[in-house]
Amino acid sequence: MSKDREFLWRRLHSLLGVVPVGLFLAFHLSLNFTAVGGEKVYNDATGLMELVPHSLLLLMEWVIIYIPLMFHAFYGVYIALTATHNTKNFSTFRNWMFKLQRFTGIFLVIFVAWHVFQTRVQKALGADVDFNMMVEIVDNPWMLGFYIVGILSATFHLANGLWSFLVSWGITQSPKSQQITTYISMFVFVVLSIMGVAAILAFV
């Protein structure tokens, strides 16, 4: 792959990780967070999506979610497998964040694929994607743990990826601005993690 082409692919990968994939994750966690209000609140909130015509909803899912997500995931695996880690020689915070970003990315490919199978695929087969479905999914302690790790991996990957996005796109160039966005990304991670974990525990 030529350097110019790889540069463009990496920029596209970075952009799609924030828009629309990152925005969708924040929306998805916010929607699931309604589960803390109980079964009716959750079902009413998620049921609003059913008001969108099926063909339009399907088109939106593929264009806004699935296609960008698959590109970001598969190209991300390529980056993870070909990237050079400096953690053996340098114990800096950013080098460890770099390594964790790649590790969580690979894990999320497995987690997201399984989550889609348990929800969207089952819906296509006639199952109802509602509060009770999630209760049944996390009824197994191992599956609950798997989902918690998946949620934390996703929120970290987004928060740290947001920092990388701002740097790679030249938005934060000075050490001070990068330090500030480090704190912002930590805040994003904590807030989204609390929402995500609280949501999944609401089904227990």
Model region roles, listed by residue range:
Residues M1-V204:
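Membrane-embedded alpha-helical bundles that constitute the cytochrome b-like, heme-associated redox core
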